[in-house]
Structures are given as C-alpha cells and as structure tokens.
C-alpha cells in the first residue's frame, strides 16, 4: 500500500520486530495532523520531539493501553532537514525555514545577528544535507549547510550558548561527533576523519587562512567621523614563540552601502604593546589573522587567543 508520511509506528516492547498491533502486545501507531510529512526527531530525557515540515510535537510514554501519546507544541516552525536538530545544554536547538529555534518545553525563536547572511545565500534544494552539531567544550551549537553556489556542505554557522553570540565560516564537514566518547570532536570529509580542537598545525605545516573578523561597529556618532590612531592588542600566544606573529587589519567605511577600505595592517608579536595606525570613518571592522608565510618556522605550531583589544578613537569632524 501507499506510505503515510505523517504516520508514526512503534513496535512491541518485548519484540522490536513486531509492529502489528495486537491485544496481547504494545505495538501501535499514531498519526500527526499538522504538516505534510515527518522530517526528523530528537530524543531527550522525558520525551521524543518530532518535527514535521511545519510543526513540532512531543511524544511521551503513557503506558497501557495507548503506550505513547503525542502533543502538538507549535504549528509555525517546521524542521528544514532530517538532521537539523540537536540536543544542547539548554534544550533542543533546530533550524527551520528562515530562523533558528530552541525547544525547552516551549518553542522560542533565537535572536540571530547573521540570519540574513545564512538564508540569503543558501541552497534550499539541498537542505536535507544540513546537520546540526554540538561542541560542548566551547558551549557551541551549530549547523553545517550548503551555500547557494554549492550542492554540498561548504559553510557553518555557530551559536555560542554562553556568550549568546553568532559566528560563521567556510568548512566542509559531512558528519560530526562531539567529544565524550573520544577526547576531542571528530568530523568527516572526503573519506577522512578529522580531530578538532587539538593542535595548531595543518598536517605538520603552518595553518593558512586563519582569522577572526568583527562585524561592523560604529566609530562615529551619527553624522560625526572618528579617527583611530592606535591599537592596543590583547593577544595571548599559546606557546613560547620568538618569530611568530599575527596581523591586525583595520578596515573602515563612511556609509553603510560602501565597500570596506583597508587602512592599516599591523604585525603583532608577543612583544608588541601598541600599534600606531591612521584610520578615519564612521564604521570599522577589525580582523586578526595568522601570518600565512609557511616558510617562517615561527608560524608552525603557532596558537593564539584573542582578548579585549582596545582602540584609541577620537571624534574627527563632520566630513
């Protein structure tokens, strides 16, 4: 017969292969009413949370004669892909069509500062490949997803549940296992299994294209321009290095629609206390990046951590 995409069937408690409901067993079925198909499910301590393409349900054990019962939780938030939900520290985090949510007894939308970046450049036709993940050591939940120009996963977006901030990047990973069973997270791509959050090298060589970049922040007040005259870096190098360094790049723009202009690139080492620069505008972006020169032995095993870097900013007129 035809398959009902909204039907849940469960087996007998004594025989996992027996799905035919009989008066002598606990097998049975339940049909969901809201949506056109069941997309995915996540098990938590007290319930199984089931997602259709439009709704969220809670399925709980109630005992005989019904065995299980389902309750409709929300009708406006379906799951975008079968693996797009994951259990985190505060509930079940999931990706829907155009937004991110958390379920912890009720469904709540997560405020997201990068929503437009993700969903304006996103391959909806490959949404079934999205998979959510947790990096519990760093209080992170995230999603690997395909951009509009790719049929495969090539990007990620992460929500830090402790800091309540978002960040994103480019990375191809098709499966992820958080630390716990193993000491470090494990992820796969191109038939390789990679350990994450360990070491600072790329298979024995210095890593390239390592950076962290801020979003735009206002340095001018309304119609005022401002100038940045110096940077006091707060960068801790994670091992003894004599020749390793990072670059702090300062970019500015005068109007929101303008392109960013790089005004200064300052090399920062463990001995740098201040870098003098000249940058003027209304908005700025600061980027900290590793030096990509693999011939420099100081860049091998170079790890660093960014703290609260300070800028010397002064008002600089109206034009």
Show which residues each predicted segment covers:
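Beta-propeller and closely related beta-pinwheel folds
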Residues: 1-130
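Beta-sheet repeat architectures centered on beta-propellers
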Residues: 36, 76-91, 97-319
């Amino acid at each position: 017969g035809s398959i009902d995409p909204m039907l849940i069937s469960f087996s007998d408690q004594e025989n996992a292969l027996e799905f035919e409901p009989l008066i002598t067993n606990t097998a049975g079925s339940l049909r969901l009413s809201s949506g056109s198909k069941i997309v995915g499910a996540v098990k938590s301590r007290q319930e199984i949370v089931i997602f259709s393409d439009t709704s969220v349900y809670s399925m709980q054990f109630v005992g005989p004669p019904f065995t299980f019962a389902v309750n409709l939780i929300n009708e406006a938030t379906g799951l975008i892909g079968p693996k797009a939900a994951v259990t985190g520290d505060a509930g079940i985090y999931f990706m829907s069509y155009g937004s991110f949510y958390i379920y912890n007894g009720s469904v709540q939308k997560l405020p997201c500062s990068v929503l437009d970046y993700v969903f304006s450049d996103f391959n909806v036709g490959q949404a079934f490949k999205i998979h959510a993940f947790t990096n519990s050591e760093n209080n992170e939940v995230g999603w690997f997803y395909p951009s509009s120009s790719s049929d495969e996963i090539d990007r990620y977006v992460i929500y830090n549940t402790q800091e309540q901030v978002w960040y994103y990047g480019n990375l191809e990973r098709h499966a992820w296992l958080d630390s716990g069973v193993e000491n470090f997270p494990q992820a796969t791509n191109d038939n390789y299994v990679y350990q994450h959050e360990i070491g600072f090298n790329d298979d024995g060589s210095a890593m390239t294209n390592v950076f962290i970049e801020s979003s735009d922040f206002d340095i001018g007040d309304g119609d005022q321009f401002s100038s940045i005259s110096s940077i006091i870096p707060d960068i801790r190098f994670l091992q003894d290095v004599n020749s390793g360094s990072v670059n702090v790049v300062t970019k500015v723009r005068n109007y929101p629609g303008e392109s960013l202009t790089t005004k200064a690139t300052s090399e920062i080492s463990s001995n740098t206390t201040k870098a003098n620069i000249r940058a003027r505008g209304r908005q700025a972006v600061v980027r900290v990046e590793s030096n990509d020169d693999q011939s420099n032995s100081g860049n091998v095993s170079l790890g660093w951590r960014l703290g609260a870097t300070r800028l010397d900013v002064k008002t600089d007129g109206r034009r």
